Amino acid sequence: MTVARFPSLAHWGAFTALVENGRVIGCEPFARDPAPSNMLEAIPDMVHSPLRIARPAIREGWREGKARTGTERFHEVSWDEALDAVAAELARVRETFGNTAILGGSYGWSSAGRVHHARSLVRRFLFLGGGCVDQVGNYSFGAAQYLLPRVIGTFQPAVGQITDWSSIVKHTRLVLAFGGLAIKNGQVTSGGAGTHSMETWLRRAKDAGIEFVSISPLKSDAPDFLGAQWVPIRPNTDTALMLAMAHTLLSEERYDASFVARYCTGFEAFRRYLLGLDDNVPKDAQWAEAITGVAADAIRELARRAAATRSMITCAWSLQRAHHGEQPYWAAIVLAAMLGGIGLPGGGFAFGHGSSNGIGVPRVDVAGPEVPLPLNPARSMIPVARMADMLLHPDDSYEFNGRRYSYPDIRLVYWAGGNPFHHHQDLNRLQRAWQKPETVIVHDSWWTPTARHADIVLPATTTLERNDVGGSSRDSFVLAMHRAIDPIGGARNDFDIFRALARRLGYETAFTEDRDEMGWCQWVYDQVRASATAKGVALPGFQQFWAEGFVEMPPPERDYVLFEDFRRDPERHPLKTPSGRIEIVSDAVAGFDYADCPSHPAWLPPAEWLGSASAQHWPTPARLPAATRRSRRCSGKTASLWLIPSTRWSRPPRSSILRRCRRATAW
């Protein structure tokens, strides 16, 4: 039988689905991709997995209020019965408790396609129905998202708007990579990509003679071909190392005093902190050695090398996914400011290298495809990481970004396309919190832990069972995603599910805007095309794009250098901070009066690290880097436990310890 071919896209890259007799039999990587991810090989098994949800199902014991343990039986029902139950429950909660009793943030990565992007659709549906409690921030770079605007006036450098790799290759001589440059992490980007270029750019940088230093607990966080100097560091101590480097620059008069004076505010208070003038603790290399495990002489030499040439300081997202995660990013900015390279080609700081595909890749700044999101009439939100706190402690107050809020009393959770039982912290606590709502509704394609802990489960199609348009703001391609097979079982796409619910609740036209699936595919592409036109880039019409399967943006005419305009003229191009400068000391943060985030970068010992009292009983830290062959859901077997030799290793692990690792809390 003839094999049919359909262009498509996943978060780990573009591909062509190969279909025979209605079944996906393989995935052929996109021809333009120099380094396609081998995770594409798993797609046929995922689509045809025995864990697929075949039909709508309702949990036994839901109406009686029995606990959600993840082990109850589900009874399959018709789509009409399931949709009627969902619509009735939404109406009941809205009428009885108000829209702020519904949690609808639905954080998750279900689709690289933007029309069927589940989180966008569930929020659009709930916002148009009166609103809900939304989620803000993210698990990827949430600390940076709210710190960086206080320090440099924008969080865009955290999501990839940083000095281009092309500028680095031409001008940088030394890259200090805190958290390393793990190529395996470059397999994935939200929204997918036409090319995986991280290895390409690293090889170009190496060929250009750039020296690399990888500062990470794992040597494997930098590829062998870089020949990077490895500086093994105790986990969660990067801030102390950066402060000691800053102290070396200051005490040896190697820092750029003129840059600091013109482009920064608050240096004097930070200088006093570095020198220990107020606490009698100089933050020098000897001090940092005791914390980081990096020799004092090595710390001083790193600082001297960075000051002697054009240097780029880059930090992986992992640094700020930890207790006091604001501090290493703030310290990196201040260290880069003292080196004086901010705003110069190949100099300054960057975030996200080694964390995701597309970071720093030269690209015309054209908007990516997305479905429009209306305002949330409920005007209510929580930080994503506080979900369990909210469910367990309704009406309690909490502090966030300098303001005091109260947790809403959630009666209904609506989750589409995500799996919080994978990515939330302290899963045992989350399971307790998950018992609090009266109803949990989930859309998913597989029986994930979240689906098994739901009351009403609606089976959603996978990417290959619907049409879509995908692409990332970090990539130069916009890609057509053709439906390759019929929906499996009774699955429906999220758009059609929400359209049917909106019809039952009286706002179908507002939700669809009289567009069907293909109408929305054309609409989101046309928005990209209009954005490209405004930047002087001509793209073909939708029909040609759909037939050819992709369009590619041309490369930019010149390299992008972060804060280049600001450096050239800080008066005409001030930063969006209160001072218009880089805020080494933030009066706004000082005004928050947070014990765990002072007004300037500082060393704050984490709750868990090798220097804490608990390390006397638990001397072996657990590192949980992203897996090499799977993304962020549940597909794939549990990875083996690596035991790294160390002078701190005092006894072999007991089997009971290894068993407990499976239930450990992850930061």
What label would you give each PLM region?
Residues 97-107, 135-141, 257-264, 301-303, ...:
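Short coil/turn segments at secondary-structure boundaries
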Residues 62-81, 247, 254-296, 484-587:
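N-terminal leader/propeptide and maturation segments of large enzyme subunits in energy/redox metabolism
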Residues 105-113, 287-291, 316-324, 355-356, ...:
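Conserved short loop/turn motifs at secondary-structure junctions
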Residues 1-254, 295, 588, 597, ...:
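N-terminal export/assembly segments and adjacent metallocofactor-ligating motifs
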Residues 48, 77, 81, 116, ...:
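Conserved active-site and cofactor/substrate-binding residues in soluble primary-metabolism enzymes
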Residues 309-402:
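Acidic catalytic cores of enzymes that act on phosphate-bearing nucleotides/polynucleotides
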